[in-house]
Swiss-Prot record:
Keyword flag RNA-binding: no
Single GO cellular component term: ribonucleoprotein complex
Key word Iron present: no
GO biological process terms held by the UniProt record: translation
Entries under InterPro entries matching the protein: Ribosomal_eS6, Ribosomal_eS6_arc, Ribosomal_eS6_CS
Highest taxon above the source species: Archaea
Protein name as annotated: Small ribosomal subunit protein eS6
Organism: Methanothermobacter thermautotrophicus (strain ATCC 29096 / DSM 1053 / JCM 10044 / NBRC 100330 / Delta H) (Methanobacterium thermoautotrophicum)
Lineage: Archaea, Methanobacteriati, Methanobacteriota, Methanomada group, Methanobacteria
Keywords: Ribonucleoprotein, Ribosomal protein
NCBIfam families: PRK04290.1-3
Pfam families documented for this protein: Ribosomal_S6e
Homology family: Belongs to the eukaryotic ribosomal protein eS6 family.
Gene coding for it: rps6e
């Protein structure tokens, strides 16, 4: 399955779709891991995984190990904003490991390459 990778930089965020053949290098990585951008066609860039969501829209959570899906009682943080003080709710989260069920991966640029992102992804945005 193809991944949608959101790449955030200080100036701008861009989204690109990664082919299934290229995305094999991302399977098994967890939130907080850094990887070389050449895996997804961004040579010279170094990216850090900050989150994502699965095929049903459930967010990945750093504190949930593995690629499983759980229902957790939360009072704030990732995936839930309480309306009143002390309010808690049971929410579904995806684990912190990238698997075939993940659709969107959020990343942030750690090291920039020689070419700007817009130049590398120019053909994809048109």
């Amino acid at each position: 399955m193809a991944f949608k990778v959101v790449i955030s930089d200080k100036e701008k965020s861009v989204q690109m779709e990664v082919d299934p053949s290229e995305s094999r290098g991302l399977i098994g990585l967890t939130i907080g891991d850094e990887f070389d951008g050449s895996i997804i066609g961004l040579s010279g860039y170094k990216l850090k995984i900050t989150g994502g969501s699965d095929k049903n829209g459930f967010p990945m959570k750093k504190t949930v190990p593995g690629a499983r899906r759980i229902r957790s009682l939360v009072s704030g943080g990732v995936g839930y904003k309480p309306r009143r003080d002390g309010e808690r709710r049971r929410k579904t989260f995806r684990g912190n490991t990238i698997s075939d069920d993940i659709v969107q991966i959020n990343t942030v640029v750690i090291e920039k390459g020689e070419k700007p992102l817009e130049e590398l992804l120019g053909a994809d945005e048109e």
